[in-house]
Design a protein with these regions (language model features):
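The serine-hydrolase catalytic nucleophile loop
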Residues: 37-49, 205
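Active-site glycine-rich loops that stabilize anionic/oxyanionic intermediates
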Residues: 34-39, 197
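Catalytic nucleophile-loop/oxyanion-hole region of alpha/beta-hydrolase
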Residues: 41, 67-99
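Conserved alpha/beta-hydrolase
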Residues: 45, 49-71
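Short beta-strand element of the alpha/beta-hydrolase
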Residues: 26-35
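N-terminal cap/lid segment of alpha/beta-hydrolase-fold proteins
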Residues: 1-24
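The alpha/beta-hydrolase serine catalytic core
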Residues: 112, 124-213, 217-221, 226-257
Length: 257
């Protein structure tokens, strides 16, 4: 079963999409967190929700401000608003499924926001089973690459329009907010990192460095996979690894150290 709905919290308006198994009660809950310029309706989150639903998982996905169906404009795209959007949706999902394991599948920028919010997130929902697909550990640097400017040029223009699934602006203030949190640090949470061997956007070296400073992190490099995991067989491997982690917090493939 699939349906759309909206959540509200103070100034936030959050479009959401929920998938529940067609037969039987859900066994686990997944919060799906999209990447920068994406939405709750991206192919990755849709495929994940549909495939995991076969195994009894419910999935809740949402749009960040200025993404997807969000009525919030580009000025609402701040790091604080993204964190609060994540926490609000997580709280709703946890209240709906209070007795189920709480799992998170987050990609790119969504993984970055999840790491920013992780300590508060665990206060809201308790223990989290976390899968990060191609996490963007240097989001501020990535944003400079997307606007094709150095920091001084961006400061001078203050605002740049990006063409993604939806056209929106990014501001220099948003860039400065991203500078305040470097995700390449240590965390007290078991997690699985999935990264494409031939990712053309995010450096694999960051993933190895993250793994080395986080003892509870498992890293799997998907052979021949690009940033979008479009290589034949790559997405099937992502699904299998994600299911293994969410059900048993282990992976059958060996970890890369």
């Amino acid at each position: 079963m699939e349906r759309y709905f909206s959540l509200s919290q103070e100034t936030l308006r959050i479009p959401c999409r929920i998938f529940e198994p067609d037969f039987g009660a859900p066994k686990r809950c997944i919060l799906g967190v999209h990447g920068f310029g994406g939405s709750k309706d991206t192919e990755i989150l849709t495929n994940l929700s549909e495939e995991m639903g076969i195994f009894g998982f419910a999935s809740v996905c949402f749009d960040f401000p200025a993404h997807g169906d969000s009525v919030m404009d580009s000025d609402a795209l701040t790091l604080d608003n993204c964190v609060e959007t994540l926490l609000c949706t997580a709280r709703w999902a946890h209240n709906r499924y209070p007795d189920l394991d709480f799992c998170i599948f987050a990609s790119g920028f969504g993984a970055y926001v999840t790491l920013v919010a992780l300590e508060r997130l665990e206060e809201v929902v308790g223990k989290v089973k976390l899968v990060l697909q191609t996490p963007n550990l240097r989001m501020a640097d990535t944003l400079l690459g997307m606007v094709r400017m150095n920091e001084e040029q961006f400061r001078n223009v203050q605002r740049v329009t990006l063409n993604a699934e939806r056209k929106f602006d990014v501001t220099y203030d948003f860039y400065r907010q991203l500078r305040t949190f470097q995700a390449l640090t240590t965390y007290e949470c078991p997690m699985l990192l999935l990264h494409g061997e031939k990712d053309e956007i995010l450096p694999v070296e960051d993933m190895f460095n993250f793994r080395r400073i986080n003892d509870d992190c498992k890293l799997v490099i998907i052979p021949d996979a690009d940033h979008q995991f479009l290589t034949p067989g790559a997405w099937d491997m992502v699904l299998d690894l994600t299911r293994d982690w969410f059900e048993w917090e282990q992976v059958l493939l060996c970890d890369w150290s």
